[in-house]
């Protein structure tokens, strides 16, 4: 049926901030939906609170509202815009839950807004555990024995009847939030309690556990006519029991028989038909590996993380097709953009293997519980495409960027002596490290059957891993052979003998190298096994023409000719990435993406990569992208002229450069991932565009940067380097406390601490770092002043500063975890001018061509530089959106030779707007048990939101509400702070009391507050009698927790338990007094009943331009 003609304006709900369980895949889905509707001439209104997304660009929708994803704000937008329809299925679980609230409130009926795509009754059939169970029973689809409950006692009674273990699945949550596997009653009590609290309707499903069965997913599409197709089937390498977001996933399924595949495919089509889904749908099955028995585990009646993976794996644009269906089209009326010939009714066919590997945040959280279960813990994922499983697996591993370029280095040298018992013990645990223990077990010649019995991983996958290990063994034997034949034991002679061997004896060794490359082994991995250098391995390959070809993703296994330049590498194959007949390399530029989403490197860098490509297209350049993240907009085949789905690893990038011969490579916009590649690529002859590699080094090398600051007359906090604990103490005495300490060999704020006393320093040096001449520790003065952040653009001569951001938390909290307001409110004119002057001097002094990010601290009236990043930063999307200045486009054009004057921009600091914008961090602590929620120099947030308004307090309120703070004006506040913070906390406590909240405090804090004349109820510590602090939190008597801590003291351990209890009970826990003050400001705004207006970003910017 044709498109509906009654839809003139449609509202799309986005998914909000990046959190574990809901990442950047919804930015990809939302941008596709916006594009589809605008192509059809429909006016698009978008609401999303995440400024880092591409979907919130003003050119993506006619009206963009950066407002909290809360029912009251959506209602205000509906009242103002009067849309004809609403699409909620592109906003993940957040979108679905909001749609349900809007339907139940009657607001959609009142304003005659149609819920487009899947209906609310269909959504409830899939999401409400009770209704879903009944529906499956009605159509004869098997589900595990289960019961829907709303109390812990009900859960216990059911588990007692069916026996342990049981799985808990909350209704209306994302990423398995609140769920888990309970092995006994004690575990069930805790998991069920969390699950009930996490569920939108306080409902959980307790079901019989089928751990060990295969987990298989089907991505299905249906239109209003009832046409259904399966787009992709995917098999989890990990058996049931590990959340699919934390599993290794293969597409297409690798171990199913045709009978099993057809059985599950028919079941999937039957289920989507019964649920009357209109659009995309993900269905998860558990399959008994020993019979044809299966269970339906879950149905997601919306675009999901798996949808993004299936889209990139097949080339079938699921979100785009679902959006077309939502406005009335049927599948046979939608054409396939990849082939340009087939319709969307044509099921994709794959002649390659796709693998997804999860990216976990445990490199940031050493003490976190690494055990995997039904509650997701991965922050992101990578995808790889190969002609065989081994190739795809090793590519995906390289793409993870976890300091393990390949499996050969996955277990440290010390682990060579591991006993078999220890390996078997580790195999029995389901942790993020299980893959490396699997390989270690195979190396130790533990039988595959024994490994299978312990892990339930299919023998097919274990054999593939054994194939990889066999190459290691063959190359190691080759090294021994050549060393025995070499008199001088000389590396060059070994290389010559290796070459000679390859040329002679029927090229046996050359064949081994060729087969190893076909299986995905990197030069690094082969180097580690043979004893040769990477450069030697590379030279041997090139000499014998062992280089990758590039195959095209075409959705149809070559049955139809494809138009889409979307490639992956393969050895010993015909090359399908044929360059244009006319050489155009002087108008061709490669942009490096940012890889998987992780803490410290989020969707902001995908935003930057995409905007760089758009700028190159504006200039008439052919744009190329290398990236490996299936969730992102940058890996949409429509964004760049040619997309390479490859690891961001030196060898893989160099191979693409050799294939495409671009004019240059842009590394500024892919975060630290791309920046780290700049030097090795330049060393190999690539032209790094923008700021030179040597100038990047001047910004990042401590000594060189200090020399520049001295030359420019710019201050920075005093600091020195210690190579021993004794020296650290001497430096500390010289500089004075407090101090910032960090290991010199760790980037990105990892293992950084603020120490306030000699005891703090002793604890840090003992437990946090290994200090030696090879691994020195950097010690700097900690100036707890106002932190200022600037993103600027330089064309080599002039500097544009869109605006100045002021951090709400003082220095000491990582900039990514700080709230930031724009424009800066607390700067006097002299300080502002000095910051602008310093920024211009640094940009010019470092010969920046592109973007520079600078962080300052203003302390006792002086301005100090604390960090300079010669690349795009996390705040670029935020500052670009609220000022209307497209920083990445300006920077890219400057790199390509266009001055600001040529582009029509004036240099200097831009005028301040009349409105305020506040950026707030968002954390995923609830998903990561045993992680301390306290904020410090090491980044912990996974995403961000924005609040905007003409009133700063209201903008602050919106930002805190959007970030997940539950803001209300009743209940109690628990205050327990370190001695150094007691004086500063007093006025905050008085403000809480003025709002009518009851004050609770631990003994030391309570005594101080009483002495100040403040009425406070003292509560026992955790080690004391009951009811204690934890009991009060669990009983709901406390609505806010303010807790600061002291390093290495007993209260820190008490504080950890308090902070965790707050997080696990959904209570705001504030570990910075500045954040507490900001919350109070928001609460006071609410108390005054100030009106909360909504206004589109376009309308704000329109006033700025007038």
Swiss-Prot record:
<feature type="binding site">
    <location>
        <position position="175"/>
    </location>
    <ligand>
        <name>ATP 1</name>
    </ligand>
</feature>
<feature type="binding site">
    <location>
        <position position="129"/>
    </location>
    <ligand>
        <name>ATP 1</name>
    </ligand>
</feature>
<keyword id="KW-0028">Amino-acid biosynthesis</keyword>
<feature type="binding site">
    <location>
        <position position="208"/>
    </location>
    <ligand>
        <name>ATP 1</name>
    </ligand>
</feature>
<feature type="domain" description="ATP-grasp 2">
    <location>
        <begin position="706"/>
        <end position="896"/>
    </location>
</feature>
<feature type="binding site">
    <location>
        <position position="783"/>
    </location>
    <ligand>
        <name>ATP 2</name>
    </ligand>
</feature>
<feature type="binding site">
    <location>
        <position position="867"/>
    </location>
    <ligand>
        <name>Mg(2+) 3</name>
    </ligand>
</feature>
<dbReference type="InterPro" id="IPR006275">
    <property type="entry name" value="CarbamoylP_synth_lsu"/>
</dbReference>
<feature type="binding site">
    <location>
        <position position="869"/>
    </location>
    <ligand>
        <name>Mg(2+) 4</name>
    </ligand>
</feature>
<feature type="binding site">
    <location>
        <position position="241"/>
    </location>
    <ligand>
        <name>ATP 1</name>
    </ligand>
</feature>
<keyword id="KW-0665">Pyrimidine biosynthesis</keyword>
<dbReference type="InterPro" id="IPR011607">
    <property type="entry name" value="MGS-like_dom"/>
</dbReference>
<dbReference type="InterPro" id="IPR033937">
    <property type="entry name" value="MGS_CPS_CarB"/>
</dbReference>
<dbReference type="GO" id="GO:0004087">
    <property type="term" value="F:carbamoyl-phosphate synthase (ammonia) activity"/>
</dbReference>
<feature type="region of interest" description="Allosteric domain">
    <location>
        <begin position="965"/>
        <end position="1106"/>
    </location>
</feature>
<dbReference type="GO" id="GO:0005737">
    <property type="term" value="C:cytoplasm"/>
</dbReference>
<comment type="function">
    <text>Large subunit of the glutamine-dependent carbamoyl phosphate synthetase (CPSase). CPSase catalyzes the formation of carbamoyl phosphate from the ammonia moiety of glutamine, carbonate, and phosphate donated by ATP, constituting the first step of 2 biosynthetic pathways, one leading to arginine and/or urea and the other to pyrimidine nucleotides.</text>
</comment>
<feature type="binding site">
    <location>
        <position position="284"/>
    </location>
    <ligand>
        <name>ATP 1</name>
    </ligand>
</feature>
<feature type="binding site">
    <location>
        <position position="242"/>
    </location>
    <ligand>
        <name>ATP 1</name>
    </ligand>
</feature>
<keyword id="KW-0055">Arginine biosynthesis</keyword>
<dbReference type="InterPro" id="IPR011761">
    <property type="entry name" value="ATP-grasp"/>
</dbReference>
<feature type="binding site">
    <location>
        <position position="867"/>
    </location>
    <ligand>
        <name>Mn(2+) 4</name>
    </ligand>
</feature>
<feature type="binding site">
    <location>
        <position position="814"/>
    </location>
    <ligand>
        <name>ATP 2</name>
    </ligand>
</feature>
<feature type="binding site">
    <location>
        <position position="298"/>
    </location>
    <ligand>
        <name>Mn(2+) 2</name>
    </ligand>
</feature>
<feature type="binding site">
    <location>
        <position position="855"/>
    </location>
    <ligand>
        <name>Mg(2+) 3</name>
    </ligand>
</feature>
<feature type="domain" description="MGS-like">
    <location>
        <begin position="965"/>
        <end position="1106"/>
    </location>
</feature>
<feature type="binding site">
    <location>
        <position position="215"/>
    </location>
    <ligand>
        <name>ATP 1</name>
    </ligand>
</feature>
<feature type="binding site">
    <location>
        <position position="781"/>
    </location>
    <ligand>
        <name>ATP 2</name>
    </ligand>
</feature>
<feature type="binding site">
    <location>
        <position position="298"/>
    </location>
    <ligand>
        <name>Mg(2+) 1</name>
    </ligand>
</feature>
<feature type="binding site">
    <location>
        <position position="815"/>
    </location>
    <ligand>
        <name>ATP 2</name>
    </ligand>
</feature>
<dbReference type="GO" id="GO:0006526">
    <property type="term" value="P:L-arginine biosynthetic process"/>
</dbReference>
<feature type="binding site">
    <location>
        <position position="867"/>
    </location>
    <ligand>
        <name>Mn(2+) 3</name>
    </ligand>
</feature>
<comment type="subunit">
    <text>Composed of two chains; the small (or glutamine) chain promotes the hydrolysis of glutamine to ammonia, which is used by the large (or ammonia) chain to synthesize carbamoyl phosphate. Tetramer of heterodimers (alpha,beta)4.</text>
</comment>
<feature type="binding site">
    <location>
        <position position="169"/>
    </location>
    <ligand>
        <name>ATP 1</name>
    </ligand>
</feature>
<feature type="binding site">
    <location>
        <position position="300"/>
    </location>
    <ligand>
        <name>Mg(2+) 2</name>
    </ligand>
</feature>
<dbReference type="InterPro" id="IPR036914">
    <property type="entry name" value="MGS-like_dom_sf"/>
</dbReference>
<feature type="binding site">
    <location>
        <position position="812"/>
    </location>
    <ligand>
        <name>ATP 2</name>
    </ligand>
</feature>
<feature type="binding site">
    <location>
        <position position="298"/>
    </location>
    <ligand>
        <name>Mn(2+) 1</name>
    </ligand>
</feature>
<feature type="region of interest" description="Oligomerization domain">
    <location>
        <begin position="402"/>
        <end position="577"/>
    </location>
</feature>
<keyword id="KW-0436">Ligase</keyword>
<keyword id="KW-0067">ATP-binding</keyword>
<keyword id="KW-0677">Repeat</keyword>
